[in-house]
Amino acid sequence: MAEQDERLERYDPTEIEPRWQRRWEELGLHTTDLTDTSKPNYYLLTMWPYPSGDLHIGHWYVKTPTDAIARYKRMQGFNVFYPVGFDAFGLPAENAAIKRKIHPREWTVANMEKMRLQFRICLLYTSPSPRD
């Protein structure tokens, strides 16, 4: 048991995770080519978050099941299109910006970039958007 505890104490995610994230990028795990006719296409969509702040547990409550489906379908040989987007046309983002005395566009764009990074860090297997 002491040996196992020692190994757990040595785990440093800031050292280990970036290495694997780079490897998975190299392997193209986020790549979707809907023109590839050698694999059947599978489309997956879930609710898009409001870009009004940081991601929180509610986002993962919605994203985790669809992320698992996307991974499973990829393992089955499907070409999975699982886009990530943002519901930036509502009042939550605008109200959050006004509360902070920031222009809503500036606030929304900054939060969308931050959320994209958070999704990547948490290894959500979404397809890159046309902007990425």
Regions found by a protein language model. Give the residues of each.
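N-terminal catalytic cores of NTP/NDP-binding nucleotidyl/phosphoryl-transfer enzymes
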Residues: 33-102
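Basic/polar N-terminal segments that are highly enriched at the extreme N-terminus
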Residues: 1-5
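Conserved oxyanion/phosphate-binding beta-strand-loop segments in alpha/beta enzyme cores
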Residues: 8-45, 79-83, 112-113
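Hydrophobic (often cysteine-bearing) scaffold residues that line and stabilize catalytic clefts
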Residues: 13-16, 58-65, 111
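Conserved small/polar residues in nucleotide/adenosyl-binding loops
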Residues: 125-132
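Short, polar/flexible loop-turn hinges at active-site or ligand-entry regions and domain interfaces
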Residues: 99-106, 127
